[in-house]
């Protein structure tokens, strides 16, 4: 009789972020009994919680990630789904594992659902988002349907749910950006093509060392059938013998190791594939040598997928770049203004400075991260006439920049609002060519993510520019 049947097992998804919500909806659609645990009680969660409850997903707000939170449902708990931001070795997760409860990541759940469609797995400290968008653009422009997701765009389980419900043609390729947090929790993922853009110190507060960070990224590439590497990255080149065989690309026009390369750019700017000219690199309109590296990584993948050089060239001509990455947002009194909010570490911020015309007014700061800063400071000394620092790290960064010999003006503000107004005034004063918002820090001291931070910057620029365009 029904009243004596065992109650259905419970699945808990951790967090009301993009991944947690997507996983909960995916499993709920499969008929699972799903709850979400969210440690915050933010009022902004009210509408989302209400919508999820209507769908049959119970939302528990103000529930911390500790073992006692699970005890009321422990006997019925079968599965816990974890978002990328939660450390894989979190003590509570280890306690649950000891009780025999399965702990799985959102990205691994998605892999099991989507593995019959070939993946391009793209990882790296910097460059992976641009490569993801650029490759997706090239494929779709060439009538090869693809979808992006993972660490950018839609959560992977959101894609899985959409494809399950869709009556349309399925995409031929999934272009998935994968962070070290995701790779660490999903050793099963085996892309058809794996792309490794760069490797510099990042997320060391979680991974402990650069060697551990390297080993995690390497897992994804080792699992890939076709591997593509950036030979211009010092760490990757140095560790070439420790990496599985693959294709190597270089944007350095006079690379001394040209015999070890598969794709490169010639002295006259032509993209070369193993000695054969494909097209001129000027097809891509984005500034900076780093974007030539991105072009080559995308070209190598596109060629393996089957596109001609002409098809790649035609697609690149119309690629306008991505939001928040060296995004030109305005021009005020002959000063170009760039939103580079996606620069969340020193290495990425250094790349932004390299690609920007001097003299530069730099706005930087936020929540500080571990990393190597000397190259970033050298770029500041070479190209920047004034620095405006914001956020939690502003005093620390001011001391750092001054102590390394920067002689320009440095101003500190807590909030971005005052920084933008000051940047324009300093730009006029010093006849700057560029104002660059390239934080070199995480956004979480004042914003939910780098996108929110970048949107705020663009809003402030729009408001301020009115005074200079009357």
From Swiss-Prot:
**Principal subcellular localization:** cytoplasm
Q: Does the keyword ATP-binding apply?
A: yes
GO terms under cellular component: cytoplasm
Q: Which keywords describe this protein according to UniProt?
A: ATP-binding, Cell cycle, Cell division, Cell shape, Cell wall biogenesis/degradation, Cytoplasm, Ligase, Nucleotide-binding, Peptidoglycan synthesis
Residues annotated as binding ATP are 124-130
A single Gene Ontology biological process assigned to it is:
cell division
MF terms in GO? ATP binding; UDP-N-acetylmuramoylalanine-D-glutamate ligase activity
Catalytic activity from the UniProt record: UDP-N-acetyl-alpha-D-muramoyl-L-alanine + D-glutamate + ATP = UDP-N-acetyl-alpha-D-muramoyl-L-alanyl-D-glutamate + ADP + phosphate + H(+)
Source organism, top-level taxon: Bacteria
Which pathway does it serve? Cell wall biogenesis; peptidoglycan biosynthesis
InterPro entries the UniProt entry points to: Mur-like_cat_sf, Mur_ligase_C_dom_sf, Mur_ligase_cen, MurD
* Subcellular location, record wording: Cytoplasm
EC no. given is 6.3.2.9
UniProt keyword annotation of ATP-binding present: yes
What's the family? Belongs to the MurCDEF family.
Question: What does the protein in this record do?
Answer: Cell wall formation. Catalyzes the addition of glutamate to the nucleotide precursor UDP-N-acetylmuramoyl-L-alanine (UMA).
Protein name (Swiss-Prot/TrEMBL): UDP-N-acetylmuramoylalanine--D-glutamate ligase
């Amino acid at each position: 009789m029904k009243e004596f049947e065992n109650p259905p097992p419970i699945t808990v998804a951790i967090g009301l972020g993009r991944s947690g919500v997507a996983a909960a909806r995916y499993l709920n659609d499969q008929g699972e009994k799903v709850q979400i645990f969210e440690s915050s009680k933010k009022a902004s969660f009210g509408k989302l919680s209400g919508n999820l409850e209507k769908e049959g997903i119970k939302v528990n707000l103000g529930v911390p990630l500790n073992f006692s939170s699970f005890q009321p449902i422990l006997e019925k708990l079968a599965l816990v789904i974890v978002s990328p931001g939660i450390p894989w070795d979190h003590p509570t997760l280890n306690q649950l594992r000891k009780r025999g409860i399965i702990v799985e990541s959102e990205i691994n759940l998605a892999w099991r659902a989507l593995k019959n469609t070939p993946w391009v797995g793209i990882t790296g400290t910097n460059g992976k988002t641009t490569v993801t968008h650029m490759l997706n653009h090239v494929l779709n422009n060439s009538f090869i349907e693809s979808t992006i997701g993972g660490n950018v765009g839609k959560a992977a389980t959101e894609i899985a749910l959409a494809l399950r419900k869709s009556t349309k043609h399925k995409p031929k390729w999934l272009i998935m950006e994968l962070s070290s947090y995701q790779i660490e929790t999903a050793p099963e993922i085996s892309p058809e093509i794996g792309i490794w853009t760069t490797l510099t110190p990042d997320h060391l507060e979680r991974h402990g060392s650069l060697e551990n960070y390297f080993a995690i990224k390497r897992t994804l590439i080792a699992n890939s059938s076709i591997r593509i590497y950036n030979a211009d990255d010092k760490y990757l080149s140095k560790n070439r013998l420790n990496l599985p065989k693959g294709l190597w690309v270089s944007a350095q026009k006079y690379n001394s190791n040209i015999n070890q390369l598969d794709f490169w750019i010639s002295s006259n700017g032509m993209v070369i594939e193993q000695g054969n000219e494909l097209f001129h690199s000027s097809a891509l309109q984005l500034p900076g040598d780093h974007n030539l590296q991105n072009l080559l990584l995308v070209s190598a993948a596109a060629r393996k997928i089957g596109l001609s050089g002409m098809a790649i060239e035609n697609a690149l001509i119309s690629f306008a770049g991505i939001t928040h990455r060296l995004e030109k947002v305005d021009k005020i009194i002959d000063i170009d203004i760039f939103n580079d909010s996606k620069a969340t570490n020193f290495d990425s911020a250094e790349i932004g400075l390299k690609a920007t015309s001097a003299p530069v007014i730099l706005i930087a700061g936020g929540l500080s991260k571990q990393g190597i800063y000397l190259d970033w400071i050298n770029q500041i000394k070479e190209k920047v006439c004034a620095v405006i620092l914001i956020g939690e790290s502003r005093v620390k960064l001011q001391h750092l920049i001054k102590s390394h010999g920067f002689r320009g003006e440095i101003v500190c503000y807590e909030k971005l609002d005052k920084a933008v107004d000051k940047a324009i005034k300093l730009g006029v004063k010093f006849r700057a060519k560029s104002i660059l918002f390239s934080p070199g820090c995480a956004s979480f001291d004042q914003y939910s993510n780098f996108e929110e931070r970048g949107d705020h910057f663009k809003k402030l620029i729009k408001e301020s520019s009115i005074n200079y365009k009357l």
